[in-house]
């Protein structure tokens, strides 16, 4: 059985976002995220996707949203070719689930939109699948994650998006990196 993995960064008071932005700037942590997820599948909610402004390069991007057509309409710069592929017609949700859409032949940016977690099957992908936000997506998918890679930012910050409780479900496997500003920890799900 194949499981998801989660990757996140949170402050001491569990904040992961403020105004749809990351409330700290830690280039070393961004590099860790990039190295870890490169070549993998990344799953994110609509708000997380919109905060990035574009698909993450060299990864397959899966976006969870209850309103896929709205997302497509709001981002014609990203999904323009996607609409063209469907002949400009408004497809039924299940019609565009089965395959990835290559957005640019020169870059390996693949993107898929999911309207339901039920449609997200980790067995469908050969690559590792990382859950990377936001708060609602973590809340729903952490129980299905075998591993959690968590950056703990060693300060409290103001925010409006919080990482869910995970401590009762996960056990610390190893501390990957420890700096004065943050630490990166690998947790394993006790029940998977």
What are these regions (language model features)?
Residues 1-192:
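Enzymes that bind and transform nitrogen-containing heteroaromatic metabolites
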């Amino acid at each position: 059985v194949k499981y998801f993995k989660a990757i996140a960064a949170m402050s001491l008071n569990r904040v992961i976002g403020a105004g749809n932005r990351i409330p700290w700037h830690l280039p070393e942590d961004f590099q860790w995220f990039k190295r870890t997820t490169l070549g993998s599948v990344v799953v994110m909610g609509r708000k997380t996707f919109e905060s990035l402004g574009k698909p993450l390069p060299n990864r397959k991007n899966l976006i969870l949203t209850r309103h896929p057509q709205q997302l497509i309409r709001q981002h014609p710069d990203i999904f323009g070719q996607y609409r063209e592929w469907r002949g400009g017609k408004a497809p039924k949700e299940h019609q565009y689930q089965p395959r990835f859409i290559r957005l640019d032949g020169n870059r390996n940016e693949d993107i898929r939109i999911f309207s339901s977690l039920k449609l997200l099957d980790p067995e469908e992908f050969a690559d590792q699948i990382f859950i990377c936000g936001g708060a609602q997506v973590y809340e729903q998918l952490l129980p299905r994650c075998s591993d959690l890679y968590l950056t703990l930012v060693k300060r409290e910050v103001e925010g409006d998006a919080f990482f869910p409780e995970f401590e009762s479900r996960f056990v610390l496997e190893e501390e990957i990196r420890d700096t004065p500003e943050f630490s990166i920890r690998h947790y394993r799900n006790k029940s998977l």
